[in-house]
């Protein structure tokens, strides 16, 4: 256990098993073991387990229920679960899981995690329906807690496009996780459909289970308007986005649960209009349209998607206006200060 002081706050850091960039089976085992390893190391340290005023934790993962239960019982304090992914439901939607014993086991684990929470904050109003039975239990509170993004501390990016095939082009950028849940293939198809436009390029930054497949697809299609880079330090992102023009968002249309990806907040903070391919019914569709900060597509026809892309990139005056609205939206709805105040206010009613 390592103890640090960050901005006047005492932080206990615990070593943990790796849960990213590994196979699904190993990841599952590591996530199952993680809360028990953390609890063991907490109990072996000087962590003030009986002096907690509140517990706030984040999901994914679904496996922290036992850890939170012990901490809550020791301190007799209220708990707040920030619920971002409705798992295992989204994995069922995408065909990753079937309604077999494994699915029902995960569902039971998630249900237990919900049971130790006094308050649950979901990302969008569309996700409230998944917890209708939970909120009917005594002393439970369910609310929408918007995603948030702190003000970025910028440093010069390590990525330079000057000597690449994207030099001088208007850049569509995707930054973040590239996995099954994103449904990224349509972005490669979009790049292929625009390969004859020498003024447009595509930049993909991040990691995930689908990166290698996406790179192979781009190579097979002989695309010279697309580049891939591994994830970079978050402090480099603002200066990187300064070189770009449109932020890309993709969610697999089979999703039935809904969220607002963190990359949307990143783009808004940077003043980048967005081109989003989303699942039907998600709150982000209406948000982008109502605030007029980009274009949204629901479907699988790359020609229609391209039309929206060109509508964005070819209208510089509109891009500038969208950029200004994005900055305003970021400050209005997605500040970390607003989220912190909401969490503290909700917990205060239980103290």
Roles of regions detected by a PLM:
Residues 149, 163-182, 188-191, 203, ...:
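Conserved donor-binding/catalytic core segment of Leloir-type glycosyltransferases
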Residues 203-206, 211-238:
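Nucleotide-activated donor-binding/catalytic signature segment of Leloir-type glycosyltransferases, i.e.
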Residues 43, 63-66, 70-74, 100-120:
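Membrane-proximal helix-turn-helix segments that form the acceptor-binding/catalytic region
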Residues 126, 145-148:
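Carbohydrate-associated surface elements
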Residues 182, 233-240, 247-268, 274-286:
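Nucleotide-sugar-dependent
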């Amino acid at each position: 256990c390592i103890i640090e002081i960050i901005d006047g706050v005492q932080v206990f850091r615990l070593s943990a098993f790796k849960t990213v960039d590994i196979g699904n089976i190993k990841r599952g085992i590591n996530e199952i073991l993680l809360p028990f390893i953390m609890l063991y190391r907490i109990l072996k340290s000087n962590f003030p387990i009986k002096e907690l005023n509140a517990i706030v934790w984040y999901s994914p993962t679904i496996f922290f229920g036992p850890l939170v239960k012990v901490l809550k019982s020791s301190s007799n304090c209220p708990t707040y679960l920030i619920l971002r992914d409705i798992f295992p439901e989204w994995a069922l939607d995408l065909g990753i899981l079937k309604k077999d014993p494994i699915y029902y086991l995960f569902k039971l684990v998630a249900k237990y995690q919900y049971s130790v929470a006094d308050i649950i904050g979901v990302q969008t109003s569309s996700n409230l329906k998944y917890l209708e039975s939970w909120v009917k239990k005594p002393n439970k509170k369910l609310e929408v807690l918007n995603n948030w993004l702190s003000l970025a501390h910028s440093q010069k990016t390590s990525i330079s496009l000057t000597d690449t095939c994207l030099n001088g082009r208007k850049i569509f950028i995707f930054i973040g996780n590239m996995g099954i849940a994103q449904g990224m293939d349509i972005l490669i198809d979009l790049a292929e459909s625009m390969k004859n436009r020498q003024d447009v390029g595509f930049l993909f930054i991040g990691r995930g289970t689908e990166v290698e497949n996406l790179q192979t697809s781009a190579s097979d299609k002989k695309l010279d308007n697309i580049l891939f880079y591994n994830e970079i330090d978050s402090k480099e992102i603002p200066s990187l986005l300064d070189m770009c023009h449109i932020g890309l968002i993709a969610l697999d249309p089979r999703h039935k649960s809904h969220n607002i990806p963190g990359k949307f907040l990143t783009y808004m903070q940077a003043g980048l209009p967005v081109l989003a391919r989303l699942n039907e019914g998600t709150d982000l569709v209406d948000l982008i349209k109502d605030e007029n900060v980009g274009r949204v597509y629901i479907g699988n026809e790359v020609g229609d998607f391209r039309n929206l892309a060109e509508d964005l990139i070819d209208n510089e005056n509109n891009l500038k206006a969208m950029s200004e609205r994005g900055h305003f939206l970021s400050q209005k709805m997605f500040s970390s200060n607003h989220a912190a105040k909401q969490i503290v206010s909700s917990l205060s009613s239980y103290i």
